[in-house]
Amino acid sequence: MRVGFLSHAGASVYHFRASIIKALKARGDEVIILVPKDEYAKRLEELNCQIIFYELKRSSLNPLIIFANFIHLKNVLKSLKLDLLQTSAHKSNTFGILAATLAKIPHKFALVEGLGSFYIDTSFKSALVRLNINFLYKLAFKFATKFIFVNESNAAFMRALGLKEEKICVIKSVGINLKKFFPLPISKEQKHAFLNTHKMPDKPIVLMIARALWHKGVREFYEAAELLKERANFIFVGGRDDNISCASMEFLKNKAVFYLGARSDVVDLIRLCDVFVLPSYKEGFSVTIMEAKACAKACVVSDCEGCVEAVSNAYDGLWAKTGDAIDLSEKISLLLDDEKLRANLAQNAAKEALKYDENEIARKYLKLYDESVKKCMKM
């Protein structure tokens, strides 16, 4: 079977689709990756697949550019003669599915990992973009084989838009690499070495890892840090870009928080922390939360969709009110004060994370693909 993975970014395929790709290749399927050429082009070669770079202006709303990109993608897909296409993210899930239909690809799967900033932002521009995205999804619903969701909330939203029940499949999480993310005790010497390197005082570490977007709860994290800065080192890790929804560098350099930028050593930072925090406004099924849980860390997350599915309140973490920095600080404070509670939550978190091994998630995808192909052969 010839299987294509279509994405708007190389990072998405490299970090979140690799386990599925490896599972397909292990059983003899041919895999082709289709992405715009970006900084992950070289790293994707590690997956030993054919890589096709296609044209995509990610941020463009110009209809002429969008149409030109669409025709180019349709022609590329038609030339590949794929049996199955897996897409992810809004443009791939809509234009990709429609292009695949014109290219006569028989099996088309769309993955919704979250609705994104356009469904959080209240500006007039975002409202218009939402209308366009919703319209395109309604078209894609007719032609996709299945829509895969990482949480029930997003499935319910698309169901309300008109997606038929038989086309809905929920596979929670994209999976965690449990060979990389697992509990590993950190010695006092290691922790002190880290604190000294970054000129931090000898205090507990409260860590947040996310893109520096306002809707990830960056402001609430910084405000909570201001309230608790005498009690803990607050560390924020995450890259920023020119997106208007990103926090400014001036804001991020606030003295109450140690901003470390984008890092590749996140597993080491997670193991160093005492409390992991994600005060997001909306999530799909947060990978960083699951990675922190896999490393046996108690988490404080917002009581928003996506986060409440990844963390069970008072069992493997705590919920804080979305957008409420005071409540967030109180929940963090509770874990800083109660070491026994923190340890119990962390133990449960590690146990729960075992259910989301990326290899098990990959098996679920392959089973879904195979069932679709077999059903089609019987018709």
Regions found by a protein language model. Give the residues of each.
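A conserved mid-protein helix/loop that constitutes part of the nucleotide-sugar donor-binding site
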Residues: 14-19, 204-227, 326
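Glycosyltransferase donor-sugar binding loop
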Residues: 35-39, 176, 209, 213, ...
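Donor nucleotide-sugar binding/catalytic pocket of nucleotide-sugar-dependent glycosyltransferases
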Residues: 52, 138-186
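Short His-centered aromatic/hydrophobic patch
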Residues: 87-93, 112
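A short helix/loop element that forms part of the nucleotide-sugar donor recognition site in Leloir-type
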Residues: 182-200, 364
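Short hydrophobic beta-strand element within catalytic cores of glycosyltransferases
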Residues: 298-302, 311
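Conserved acidic donor-binding segment of nucleotide-sugar-dependent glycosyltransferases
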Residues: 313-314, 318-325, 334-339, 354
